[in-house]
Amino acid sequence: LPKDAFVSKEMFETMELCVGCKACQRECPMSVDISKMKSEFLFHYYKKFSMKLKDKIISNMPKNIWLIKLIAPIFNKIKNIPILNKVLELLFNFSTKRTMPEVQNISPLKNIYYSQNNFSNKVILLADTFNINFEIQNLIYTIKVLNKFGYKAIIPNFDDDSLGRPLCCGRTYISYGQLDKAQAEMQRFTNYIINNNYESTPVVGIEPSCLL
C-alpha cells in the first residue's frame, strides 16, 4: 500500500460502505469492529481533507439545533414544501423520500418532569438530541414508566441550569470521526455527574446508540 493509503480518498470510499451496524463485531471470530475503525479513519482523514457540508450539519446537530428551534414555527410550516425538499436533496443529498422531522414544543415534557413525585430512587435519563427536540412524547412515556416503577427521572439540563444546552453522548461526532468533539461531550457529562454527586446514580436512555 502507498504511504498515505490510510487517509486516501480510495479508503474513504471503502469506509463509506460501513453503515455502523456492528454486525462485523458480532459475527467475526476476532470481533473486528469496522465501525470503530471507520471513526478512527475519519478522524485522521478530515485532518487532510475537508468535510462535506452535509456531514458538518449532521455531526454538529447537538450544538446547532438551537438555530432551528429559534425559527421552529417557520421551519415546521415550510419543511415539507416539495421544492424546498428538492433543493435540500440537491445541495445536501437529503432524500426527498423522507419527511423532515418537526421541531416540538418542549413545554409538555417540562410539565411532566417537574410534576414528578420525589421518589427516593433516581435515575439519570439521557435525553438524546433527536428525542428532546423532535420526539418528546417518547421521553414523556419514559418518565411515566420510570415513575410507575418508583423511580424519579433526572434530565440533566432541567436539573442543572448551568449546563446551557442539553448534554450529548457525542454519537454524531463519533459517526463522522470528530473524536475530539465527542470526547469533549463526554467530559461535559462526566463533569455533570461529579459536580452533582451522581456517581452512584444509574444512567438510562431510549436511544441504544447513545448509551452504548
Which positions does each model-derived feature cover?
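Iron-sulfur-cluster electron-transfer modules
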Residues: 3-212
